[in-house]
Amino acid sequence: MEDSEEHHFSSVEEETRYWKELAMKYKQCAENIQEELCEFQEGSREYEAELETQLQQTESRNRDLLSENNRLRIELESVKEKFEMQHSEWYRQVSALEDDLAQTKAIKDQLQKYIRELEQANDDLERAKRAAIMSLEDFEQRLNQAIERNAFLESELDEKENLLESVQRLKDEARDLRQELAVQQKQEKPKTPMRTSLETERTDTAVQASLSLPSTPSLHRAPNINIPTPATFRRGFEDSYCATPLTPAARISALNIMGDLLRKVGALESKLASCRNFVYDQSPDRTTVSMYMNRDALETRMSPHQPLCDTGLVKRLEFGTRPSSTPGPMSHPSQSVVKMLL
């Protein structure tokens, strides 16, 4: 309309031609559009079919994915449950292991403390062992000393028994001599007058001087050793044997003393005959000497410190056998003989 209004045709034919050309143009355009529409519809149908196939595929795939998703969700739930169970189990195990670790640490501390105590106790036991070893060695040393002392004492006891036998033999001889003297005193009568007071005093002085023997070295004594001796021994003789083991020098000295005493006893026995001549041939002298000898012997028996050998010698002088019939010697040699015997 606008074109018609804008265009001013000069004739009707021109206007008809114009409108024919315009109709042909629009018709050609409509045909083109119709062709395009057909092509579009055909492409749309193809595309729709393709989309439907894709939709079906997508739906089937979606269904598969949903089923897979459900399956995976179920598996996830089961895995979660398993994980929870394993987590709780692991937590319990970790808690138990922590408790065990704490207990192990406590036990380790206790064991370390116990080890220290054992080491201290071991040190104490080692010290006690060393002390026991030292005390045992000391005890063994003392035991060996005691064994040696006992062996020495046994030898001394053997010597003492021998001396006791000798003393008993001398006592038996003295008893026999005493009995013989008693018989002789009953049978004999006085043959010479009594001594004067001066001679008696001189004889007393000689006998008293003869009783004091030269001192000999005493035996080595040590305390705390007691040996039982018979009741017949004097205290001095007991003290000489009641001692600890003697040193070699003291033992030799003691043996020398005993040997000297035994030699003196033998010498006294050999010289007894010469004394008997004076004692029994001169009756007044015999009576006086016997009186003083009896008194000295009694004092010797009463004295606790007088050695046993002196008592035996006095008894041998006091009780003698009957002398042989020989001429009587003078008074002065007899006094020297008494001194030698004593």
UniProtKB/Swiss-Prot annotation:
The entry lists its GO molecular-function terms as: microtubule binding
Q: Which InterPro entries match?
A: NUDE, NUDE_dom
Q: Where in the sequence does UniProt note compositional bias of the Polar residues kind?
A: 322-342
Q: Which GO terms describe its biological process?
A: cell division; cell migration; centrosome duplication; centrosome localization; chromosome segregation; establishment of chromosome localization; establishment of mitotic spindle orientation; microtubule nucleation
Q: Where is this region: Disordered?
A: 182-203, 320-342
- Where would you find this protein in the cell? Cytoplasm, Cytoskeleton; Cytoplasm, Cytoskeleton, Microtubule organizing center, Centrosome; Cytoplasm, Cytoskeleton, Spindle; Chromosome, Centromere, Kinetochore
- PTM comment text: Phosphorylated in mitosis.
- Cytoplasm is among the record's keywords: yes
Q: Where is this region: Interaction with PAFAH1B1?
A: 89-157
Recorded GO CC terms? centrosome; cleavage furrow; cytoplasmic vesicle membrane; kinesin complex; kinetochore; microtubule; spindle pole centrosome
Alphabetical keyword list: Cell cycle, Cell division, Centromere, Chromosome, Coiled coil, Cytoplasm, Cytoplasmic vesicle, Cytoskeleton, Kinetochore, Membrane, Microtubule, Mitosis, Phosphoprotein
Which residues, by range, are in coiled-coil regions? 45-189
Describe, as the record does, how this protein assembles with itself and its partners. Self-associates. Interacts with PAFAH1B1.
User: Into which family does the record put it?
Assistant: Belongs to the nudE family.
What is the role of the protein in this entry? Required for centrosome duplication and formation and function of the mitotic spindle.
The protein depicted here goes by the name Nuclear distribution protein nudE homolog 1
State the species of origin: Gallus gallus (Chicken)
